[in-house]
Amino acid sequence: MAVHRALAAYAISLYVLLPRKSGATDKGAIKFETWEPLCLLTQDFGNLYNRAHKLNLDIDTYVTAAQADQLRLQILLSRASSKIEAAAAAAATAAIAADLAGKAKHVASCKLAATTLTATTGYLHGRIAEFLEVMTAHRGTTNKYGCLSKSRSDNSNSITDSVANLKDKCKLTVQQISPDNKATEQITKAGFTKLTATGGLTSSDLGGSGQAVCMILSTTASEVVNNGNLDEPVPYAGGYLRRKHDLTSDGNDNLATITDSASAPATRAKTDPYLQIWRAFKNLEDCESTFTSGYSRPSPETLKAADETKTAIKNYVVQKEGKYDQATDKEDDYKNLDKIFKDGKDFYPQKLWDAMDKKDLLKDATQTNEIKKLADITDRSELNKVLLYYTRQKEQTLTKELKEAQEKATQANQNDAAAKAAEDSCNKLVGGEKCNADKKCSYETETDGTKKCKFNATKAEKSGAPVTQAQTVGETEATPEKCKGKDAKTCGTTQGCKWEGETCKDSSILVTKKFALTVVSAAFVALLF
């Protein structure tokens, strides 16, 4: 019996003393399944660079397209042949301005998101790349045993990949960046799909096969720094594979399922480079939903619902200055918006977009040797030149009209004064004989039956009286009083008067108002750009 016990004890001692070829050990190669997720992640980093680049381009394209349309609409406004067209162009311009104002805060934050994602990805890309390259390079020249297992096996220490091969396989360097929004597989809004290790680099992550030759993964103090144990964990791969001296768990976050409040700050800091990318990635996806679909022109429904449209109607159709005010402005002036703004080529805003597609820009406006379409001009500086040309043309026309109207108004006032003096002169003549003897007076019966000497413009014209010539002009010229109270038919036949809305108005005043609106429009453009 004693012999059996002795043999058993001897066998146990041999089992303990002899080296074992299975199980985890220090100095073993890092298992393939431990480091492969990092290789897959660096392969996916190219998609992050491309998406960040595309977002930047999408933002610029959106803003540029919207601002170009604003300029085109301002050009149409300066060339408008009707009040409705002018109002529609002004309304569409205001709608685009409102859209850009709403996007302004997103432009800054989303450009920052794209830059942040590129910077944080580049940093971690370099950290992971260096870790994998260094571990790959740590292999022997003869049997190729080293620090990374080549395949999915606990007993595979052999390394056949060179650093160059691994760099190509894992895309450890930044590839050609081009705009693309291809979805990433290794990172989502939930986290990093395959980074499931939560203990850092532990002994269970090392392979066996008895080839414990990776000295940098030794737990023996003299083999690592020859000065005691490691003073703090080594943050391999940006902290995901943090290695403590004894290869025990370091307690990292689970990067596969991240929440902003998942861990205490002390734990979170261990893998902060990953968390920075994750936050920037979430911001990127939010921004993509805002800008990737691109700029779209305002719809009829948008224009009908906007107060800015009613302001445009007020300014250009009703011919009143200022913003639309529901409390003071007559709703009747704005009740037909649904008849102006609706789908179809015969309505706005489609008529505006069609007008942009007509080849009718003057050569002088484009400063080229060809007549162009407004839609074909995309450069904002060129559009500004065209706008300036047509704005000056309109100002010159209105300035001329204003001068002529003012001259006519002055002449009309002078004629009115002469006519009044003639009337007073006739009124002073007593008796029909004296009255009728005057070349400009007639003895007429009043409505009450009495007789009175009055000025007779027809008699004055036939007799060639000087005051008659002045009065003849005055009869056809307009003053505010002469236009006041006339109906539409009479107003249209009176020189210097024009029917506006429901009132006969002095055309000189209308020209002045039109000129003022043109100046305001030009100033508005200057403020926008």
From Swiss-Prot:
Compartments in which it is found: Cell membrane
User: Chief subcellular site?
Assistant: membrane
Q: Where is the signal peptide?
A: 1-24
Output the PTM entry.
N-glycosylated; glycan is composed of 6 to 9 mannose residues.
The glycosylation sites are N456
Q: Cite a GO CC annotation.
A: side of membrane
Keywords in UniProt for this one?
Cell membrane, Disulfide bond, Glycoprotein, GPI-anchor, Lipoprotein, Membrane, Signal, Trypanosomiasis
Propeptide at which positions? 507-529
What kind of membrane protein is this, topologically?
Lipid-anchor; GPI-anchor
Q: Where is the lipid attached (GPI-anchor amidated aspartate)?
A: D506
S-S pairs:
C39-C170, C147-C214
Q: Tell me the GO BP annotations in alphabetical order.
A: symbiont-mediated evasion of host immune response
Q: What does this protein do?
A: VSG forms a coat on the surface of the parasite. The trypanosome evades the immune response of the host by expressing a series of antigenically distinct VSGs from an estimated 1000 VSG genes.
Q: What is this protein's record name?
A: Variant surface glycoprotein MITAT 1.6
Q: Which organism is it from?
A: Trypanosoma brucei brucei
